[in-house]
Every structure is written in C-alpha cells, then in structure tokens.
C-alpha cells in the first residue's frame, strides 16, 4: 500500500471507531431492497442508462433518462435519504466547533466545485466551453502528452445541458442497485453475489481493496469478475459496476466492523455526530485539502453527513435531495447568553420561560414515540423544585429523552455538583427553559415510571399535577445501583457531555468512600436497568428530542 493510502486508511479506521455508536447492521435491509429492485426494475432501462453514461457527450435527453430511472429506484427502495435542512447552534456544539465546521465546509465547497468544473478528477476546466475542452484534449494529444486519466478517446466527457443543477445528487452508487445489477445482468444468484461482496468487505476492514485484490478474489468468487476495471470518475451513475461501488456494497454485508457506510443519520442525533467527527478530526489531525482530486475520508464523511440530516448518507437513494452539503447545513454562531430569571417561591415550581409553538410540537412528537406500556426508567439531578437534568429511558426500544435546565439556586447547585452530578453552571446557561416542565406535563397517560428512590420523582410529578402517574421504586443499595457503573460509562458515555466537573466522594462513618464518578440521569437509568437485568445491553439508545431543541432559540443564521 502506498504511504498516502496508509494514512488515508488510518483516518478511515479512526472515523469508524469514533462513529461506532451510529453504525448499524444493514445486511438484511440492503438485501430486501435488492430483491425489490430485482422484482420490479426494468433492467432494459438500466442497460440504456449504463450505455449513455459511456458516451463522451451527454445531453438533456440523457439526463432525463437518468433522473427518471433514479426516481423509479427511489420509489422501490426503503433505504433512502430525504431532504432535511440542518441547523447547528451554539449549545449542541461550541462556537469554536461551529466555526471549524463552517471553515471546513467552505474549503470543501471550493474543492468540489473546482473538481466538478472538469470532466475528470484533478483536471481543471475553468469556464471553458465544450469546444474549447475538446480542442485542449486534441492539442495535448498531438503534443504527445499522456491521455487524461485513462480516457481512451482523449476527449473530456461532459454534460451538454441547459440546467447543470439537475445533475446534483443524481450520481453515486447504492449497494442494493449494485447487487441487483450483478445478479440480473451477470446471471448470478443473489447468494453468490452476497458471498463475493462479503469477502470484499472483509478485506476492506484492513485495507482499501485494489484491482489486484479484486482479480485474486474473482478466482474464488466469479461474480466479482463483472466489476469494471475502469477508474471511477465524477458524474458517472451508480448503475456502473465500479470497484468503489462493490466495496461499498461489501461493507454492508458484514453486519460488523463499524463501517462508515452503514451510518444512519436522524435529526435527533445530527449535532452529536458532527461533534464526534470533529473530535476524531482533531485527534488524528485530519484536514480538508483544497487541492483537486478525490476526497479524503474526512472530506467524504463530512460532505455526506451535511448533505442531509435524515437517512442513509452513504448507501441510500439520495436522488430526491436538493442542494449540496453547504446548502443544506446552516450554522448559527449567535450566543445570546442567559436571561434573568425571577425568584422561585418556597415550595413552588419554578416559573420557566414559554416554549415556542414549533418546539412544543417537536416535543409532543417525540413523546408520542414513548410506549406507555413499556418499562420506563426516570431519573433527575438536582432537587424536585429545581431540577437541572431529566432522563426518561425505555430499555426495550432504546428510546430516551434527556434534557437539562439552568438552576435557580446556584449555591445548592454547586454543592450538588461537587458531590454528585459534576455539572458546571456555564454549561447550562444556554439550555431551553420550560423543557422539563412541558415534558412532565405531557407524559403519556397511563405510563408507569420506574425509579431508584421515588421520593424526588413523586414530588416532581405532584408539582406538575401528574398524580395519575404511578411509580415503581426498585430500592437498590448504593453498591447494587452502581454495579455496572464503569461498563455503562465506557459504552454510553458519549451520550452525555455535561458532567465535566470534579466529583468528591462523600465519606460516611463505617462505610467505604462513595464513587467519584459523576451522576448522569441518563446513564444512571441505564445502570439501574442493567442491575435489574443482570447485564449491560449492547442496544444503542435512540434520542427522541433533537439536540438543538435543548437550547434557546437563536436569531442570526449564517448560511454556508
């Protein structure tokens, strides 16, 4: 492997580790979509599109055929990416992180647009006309220069169309399409295709497969012989059986390896994912290179995640998504600070700011996904009349609600931070007021809450007139409750980043010192549940409320 490939693959491995919480077993889903395509797709039309993509010049008529076929594929597939504008604000990400993201997207925009100005990667076309590009190729050929990027004709392949924006998101391979074409057009069984691509995917866990690797594997798996030997080019449809398309499909056949190709993005987790990407970038010293050429792993991941915040950025159909990554991701760099809160009367619930109608609708939509008949854990940090953190967790589905609140009693908060939750006041000043109260008031009727110690939860429910909700107190000892503390923090610590302070162990006479680990309401719920069940479940929890909803509305938006 060349040294640059070694560095590139090291980045890929680092990103796989850093985003492992968002990778998924997708083999069965991809095969389901493949079978749907095999049953309903007209492969005569597929062959026509494959042929037109080999033409040196493509017209509006050719583009219409490609877009029509893409629409049909999109309608047949379950795995797709949908249009979703992403807004990242101070709170979910720090201002420095937002500025870093904005800068990287700007650099990526320049790189992508420069590369797409030519017919091939790394060949700059500027604003030359089709005729000028052809003349340039002829001059270079007559002067004895090597042919451009393996193009046998020496002519730059271009789209001669009226509206170039119609090209956006019409390309890129999809594993289901790749597998369907290999099966139908290659006359292979789907099982043989799955086996061959699985072998290619296993190789991809340790290196980037190349053409030499492909030839060796094809001896054992003949279906891989249909993969084209041509180098991938931009603006070439996903119906072509390129090596990169086959590798992507192979990654999906593993159900393991934390492959980036299996990432699914949801609006509720978008900010957390971007934060994780930036952390890996910093640790590995990754960067966006403005030099023309193929995207490096960081650039590729950043573009795909920011293109749409809802769906399968690597492997799903995205032909119905409009715009580019820098069009669909908006960064808000405004930090309004904390408004003054009125004092709280003794024994009364805090008077919290009103939520916007839009936020209330989002919260209600998330609460609808709670199963009122399922086991539901609840925990808070802070006091019932001044809570600073709330978590509600349903282990069967993995769904959870997790939010914070700025305290009114700062002195009490600092004492609790020192000996319990370890949260810092500065990290809560931008949290959305009124969120905890609205959630408690709108919990599903008939829901039964399970808690470790019910007194505080009962008081919290009474303050919000929810005496209709029953509570089960599991009454674990301190040792029992924290039996799986380290395992839970190791596995799920990424779900919460507010507990940064130093926690001191309380000393009780006749007892060993308590834990110095901070108490997180969400992770405590998972710990208590693990103690009752006897093990820590590997299921990845799913956030029901968008991360940005946890923070105050901001005003000034900067579009990238």
Swiss-Prot record:
EC top class named in words: hydrolase
Name this protein carries in UniProt: Nucleoprotein
Residues at the site labelled Important for exonuclease activity: 456
Domain of life: Viruses
Region: Disordered, residue numbers: 333-353
GO biological process: negative stranded viral RNA replication; RNA-templated viral transcription; symbiont-mediated suppression of host cytoplasmic pattern recognition receptor signaling pathway via inhibition of IKBKE activity
Annotated EC: 3.1.13.-
Comment on protein domains: The N-terminal region is important for the cap-binding activity while the C-terminal region contains the 3'-5' exoribonuclease activity. A CCHE zinc binding site is present in the C-terminal region and may thus contribute to the substrate binding and/or the specificity of the exonuclease activity.
Residue ranges, annotated region (Binding site for the cap structure m7GTP): 53-236
Assembly behavior: Homomultimerizes to form the nucleocapsid. Binds to viral genomic RNA. Interacts with glycoprotein G2. Interacts with protein Z; this interaction probably directs the encapsidated genome to budding sites. Interacts with protein L; this interaction does not interfere with Z-L interaction. Interacts with host IKBKE (via Protein kinase domain); the interaction inhibits IKBKE kinase activity.
Family: Belongs to the arenaviridae nucleocapsid protein family.
Organism listed in the record: Pirital mammarenavirus (isolate Rat/Venezuela/VAV-488/1995) (PIRV)
Function, in words: Encapsidates the genome, protecting it from nucleases. The encapsidated genomic RNA is termed the nucleocapsid (NC). Serves as template for viral transcription and replication. The increased presence of protein N in host cell does not seem to trigger the switch from transcription to replication as observed in other negative strain RNA viruses.
Entry binding sites for Zn(2+): 389, 496, 499, 520
Taxonomic path: Viruses, Riboviria, Orthornavirae, Negarnaviricota, Polyploviricotina
One function term, GO molecular function aspect: hydrolase activity
Keyword tags: Capsid protein, Helical capsid protein, Host cytoplasm, Host-virus interaction, Hydrolase, Inhibition of host IKBKE by virus, Inhibition of host innate immune response by virus, Inhibition of host RLR pathway by virus, Interferon antiviral system evasion, Manganese, Metal-binding, Ribonucleoprotein, RNA-binding, Viral immunoevasion, Viral nucleoprotein, Virion, Zinc
GO cellular component, one term: helical viral capsid
Main location: virion
């Amino acid at each position: 492997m060349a040294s640059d490939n070694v560095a590139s693959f090291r980045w890929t491995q680092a990103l796989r580790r850093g985003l492992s919480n968002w990778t998924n077993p997708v083999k069965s889903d991809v095969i389901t979509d493949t079978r749907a395509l095999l049953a309903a797709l007209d492969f005569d039309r597929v062959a026509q599109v494959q042929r037109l993509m080999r033409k040196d010049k493509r017209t509006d008529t050719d583009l219409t055929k490609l877009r029509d076929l893409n629409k049909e594929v999109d309608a047949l597939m379950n795995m797709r990416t949908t249009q979703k504008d992403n807004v990242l604000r101070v709170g979910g990400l720090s201002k420095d992180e937002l500025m870093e993201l904005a800068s990287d997207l700007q650099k990526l925009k320049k790189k992508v647009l420069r590369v797409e100005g030519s017919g091939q990667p790394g060949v700059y076309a500027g604003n030359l006309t089709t005729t000028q590009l052809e003349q340039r190729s002829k001059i270079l050929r007559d002067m004895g220069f090597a042919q451009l990027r393996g193009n046998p004709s020496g002519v730059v392949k271009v789209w001669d169309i009226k509206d170039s924006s119609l090209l956006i998101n019409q390309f890129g391979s999809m594993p289901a399409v790749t597998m369907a074409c290999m099966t139908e057009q290659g006359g292979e069984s789907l099982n043989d295709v799955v086996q061959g691509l699985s072998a290619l995917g296993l190789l991809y866990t340790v290196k980037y497969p190349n053409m030499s690797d492909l030839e060796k594997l094809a001896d054992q798996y003949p279906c891989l012989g249909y993969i084209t030997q041509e180098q991938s080019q931009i603006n070439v449809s996903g119906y072509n059986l390129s090596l990169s398309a086959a590798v992507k499909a192979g990654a999906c056949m593993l159900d393991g390896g934390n492959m980036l190709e299996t990432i699914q993005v949801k609006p509720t987790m978008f900010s957390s994912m971007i934060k994780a990407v930036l952390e890996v970038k910093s640790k590995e010293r990754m960067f966006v290179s403005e030099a023309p050429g193929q995207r490096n792993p960081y650039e590729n991941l950043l573009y795909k995640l920011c293109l749409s915040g809802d769906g399968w950025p690597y492997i799903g159909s995205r032909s119905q998504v409009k715009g580019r990554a820098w069009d669909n991701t908006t960064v808000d760099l405004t930090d309004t600070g904390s408004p003054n809160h009125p004092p709280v009367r003794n024994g009364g619930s805090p008077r919290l700011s009103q939520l916007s109608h839009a936020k209330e609708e989002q919260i209600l939509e998330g609460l609808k996904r709670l199963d009122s008949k399922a086991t539901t854990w609840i925990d808070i940090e802070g006091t019932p009349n001044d809570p600073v953190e709330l978590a509600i967790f349903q282990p069967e589905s993995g769904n959870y609600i997790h939010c914070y609140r700025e305290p009114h009693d700062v002195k009490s908060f600092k004492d609790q931070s020192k000996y319990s939750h370890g949260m810092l006041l500065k990290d809560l000043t931008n949290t959305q007021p009124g969120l905890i109260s609205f959630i408690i008031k709108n919990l599903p009727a008939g829901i039964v809450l399970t808690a470790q110690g019910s007194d505080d939860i009962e008081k919290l429910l009474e303050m919000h007139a929810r005496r209709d909700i029953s509570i089960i107190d599991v009454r674990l000892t301190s040792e029992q409750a924290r039996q799986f503390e380290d395992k839970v923090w190791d596995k799920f610590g990424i779900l919460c980043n507010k507990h940064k302070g130093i926690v001191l162990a309380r000393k009780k006479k006749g007892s060993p010192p308590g834990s110095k680990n901070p108490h997180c309401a969400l992770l405590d719920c998972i710990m208590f549940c693990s103690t009752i069940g006897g093990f820590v479940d590997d299921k990845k929890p799913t956030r029901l409320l968008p991360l940005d909803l946890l923070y105050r509305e901001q005003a000034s938006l900067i579009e990238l």
